[in-house]
């Protein structure tokens, strides 16, 4: 939306003239930065604050946004509205100052809902797969020439950004259930990929509460809207009779409306057939590994088919799909020093998955595409509460790799929980007798501690949602070779 379109919107909604300056607290987060980017391109004055620069803040600065790397009351001066991340506490000085100045303070999802209000909204929700599915839907719509606006929680690699302003009526957005704020959204189409117990503090530890919240989200659809849901997921199958909207199901299940058949993986690509009711079968080559990504593609195809998008555009988009940042993100293949007299290489893959189901899917994709590789994982648990609540699941999943290095828990603001730390998890895994995990207390020592477990035919998965992605990039920069200065500093 350019300046002319912004003027048109303000003529439709005269009250929008009151909003000129939008301030974001926690602007460096992917979800926050994406919305800020769309609004900057719509012509609004954007400012924001965060603790440190990152690629998101750099992109926003290039668009003319003012970024403060501190949290001070004066940062919100002259703001028309303050948008706050769910990670920001109520006693943040900018939030306090905004309330004192009677500046409206809203959550990220409320602003996303305003962006969606006058567009054809497509919202992608679920415990796992949201970011990739959002990127797939966006890629198909772009390939079909529909020029969508999209707001994603991860980097869309084909576009090089988390969000992009299109000039059509379509807005494709990731919907976040972590704080239940997706209830603000009122889309025309909603995808639900799966529902598992996660972020249970938001739902007071009550899984029934979580399930009902997803139902409430789907009931934000108009009666003529459509819910696209993965029938392979047992919770979704259970909830389907309670969804009072038109539904399309997808999955490997025989009763799915859009059914995945004959899946096989060759290296990083999946090959499968999609069977659609009353439509020609689609023989898909998907440039993303794993059965879980075939499901994500089936969801995207279900939405695109309902919209009437040409099959050729769908197939082109999936075959050329470039993925999203930190979702089985291939960082390179690096030569290693000779091992047992033979030179070899190691592939390096960075992945955001931090729930046992996600980690399991990543491991399965790696095994399917590269069955002969020595599978090495560098894992960083994310949050003590998640590690505590899913402790046995983590222990079971992590024993599937050939070698495991584990960093300390990334706390994300939480206090340590006894028995839910990395040392305890390593001990539990070791006692099961399959692998002997290595605890890495000093991240600077990762390359040094990684070297002895490599065989010369390796696939290294760097796994987690904390700051482990920075370690993955560092390993790529040094080509997996331990640095002398590190050894001197920490030896």
Swiss-Prot record:
GO annotation (BP), single: regulation of cell shape
Keywords of the record: ATP-binding, Cell cycle, Cell division, Cell shape, Cell wall biogenesis/degradation, Cytoplasm, Ligase, Nucleotide-binding, Peptidoglycan synthesis
GO cellular component, one term: cytoplasm
Pathway annotation: Cell wall biogenesis; peptidoglycan biosynthesis
GO molecular function term, any single one: ATP binding
SUPFAM superfamilies with a match to the protein in the record: MurCD N-terminal domain, MurD-like peptide ligases, catalytic domain, MurD-like peptide ligases, peptide-binding domain
EC number: 6.3.2.8
Subcellular localization, as worded in the UniProt entry: Cytoplasm
Enzymatic reactions: UDP-N-acetyl-alpha-D-muramate + L-alanine + ATP = UDP-N-acetyl-alpha-D-muramoyl-L-alanine + ADP + phosphate + H(+)
Keyword Cell division in annotation: yes
Pfam families linked to this entry: Mur_ligase, Mur_ligase_C, Mur_ligase_M
Residues the entry annotates as binding ATP: 126-132
Function comment: Cell wall formation.
Name of the protein in question: UDP-N-acetylmuramate--L-alanine ligase
Source organism of this protein record: Salmonella gallinarum (strain 287/91 / NCTC 13346)
Encoding gene (name): murC
């Amino acid at each position: 939306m350019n300046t002319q379109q912004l003027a048109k919107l303000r003529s439709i909604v005269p009250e929008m003239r009151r909003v000129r300056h939008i301030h974001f607290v926690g602007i460096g987060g992917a979800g926050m930065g994406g919305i800020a980017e769309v609004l900057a391109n719509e012509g609004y004055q954007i400012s924001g604050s965060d603790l440190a620069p990152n690629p998101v803040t750099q992109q926003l600065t290039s668009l003319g946004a003012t970024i403060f790397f501190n949290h001070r009351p004066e940062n919100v001066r002259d703001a028309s509205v303050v948008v706050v991340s769910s990670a920001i506490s109520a006693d943040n000085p900018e939030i306090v100052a905004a309330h004192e100045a009677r500046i409206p303070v809203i959550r990220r999802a409320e602003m996303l809902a305003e962006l969606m209000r006058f567009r054809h909204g497509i919202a992608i929700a679920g415990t796992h797969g949201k970011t990739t599915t959002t990127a797939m839907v966006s890629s198909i719509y772009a390939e079909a020439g529909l020029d969508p606006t999209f707001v994603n929680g991860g980097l869309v690699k084909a576009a090089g950004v988390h969000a992009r302003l299109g000039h059509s009526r379509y807005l494709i957005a990731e919907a976040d259930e972590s704080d239940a704020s997706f209830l603000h959204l009122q889309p025309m189409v909603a995808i639900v990929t799966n529902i598992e117990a996660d972020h249970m503090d938001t739902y007071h530890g009550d899984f029934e509460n979580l399930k009902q919240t997803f139902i409430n989200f789907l009931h934000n659809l108009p009666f003529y809207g459509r819910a696209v849901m993965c029938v392979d997921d047992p919770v979704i199958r259970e909830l389907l009779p309670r969804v009072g909207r038109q539904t399309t199901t997808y999955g490997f299940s025989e009763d799915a409306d859009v059914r995945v058949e004959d899946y096989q993986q060759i290296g990083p690509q999946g090959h499968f057939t999609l069977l659609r009711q009353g439509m020609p079968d689609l023989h898909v080559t998907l440039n993303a590994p794993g059965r879980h990504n075939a499901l994500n593609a089936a969801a995207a195809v279900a939405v695109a088919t309902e919209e009437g998008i040409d099959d050729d555009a769908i197939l082109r988009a999936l075959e050329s799909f470039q993925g999203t940042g930190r979702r089985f993100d291939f960082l390179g293949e690096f030569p290693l020093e000779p091992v047992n007299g033979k030179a070899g290489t190691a592939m390096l893959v960075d992945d955001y998955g931090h729930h046992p189901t996600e980690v399991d899917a990543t491991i399965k994709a790696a095994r399917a595409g590269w069955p002969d590789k020595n599978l090495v994982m560098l894992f960083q648990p994310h949050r003590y509460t998640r590690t505590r609540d899913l402790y046995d699941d983590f222990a079971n999943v992590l024993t599937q790799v050939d070698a495991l290095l584990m960093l300390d828990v990334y706390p994300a603001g939480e206090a340590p929980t006894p028995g839910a730390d990395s040392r305890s998890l390593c001990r539990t895994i070791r006692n099961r007798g399959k692998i002997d995990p290595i605890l890495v207390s000093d991240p600077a020592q990762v390359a040094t501690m990684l070297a002895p477990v490599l065989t010369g035919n390796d696939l290294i998965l760097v796994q987690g949602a904390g700051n482990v992605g920075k370690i993955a990039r560092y390993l790529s920069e040094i080509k997996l070779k331990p640095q002398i200065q590190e050894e001197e500093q920490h030896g």
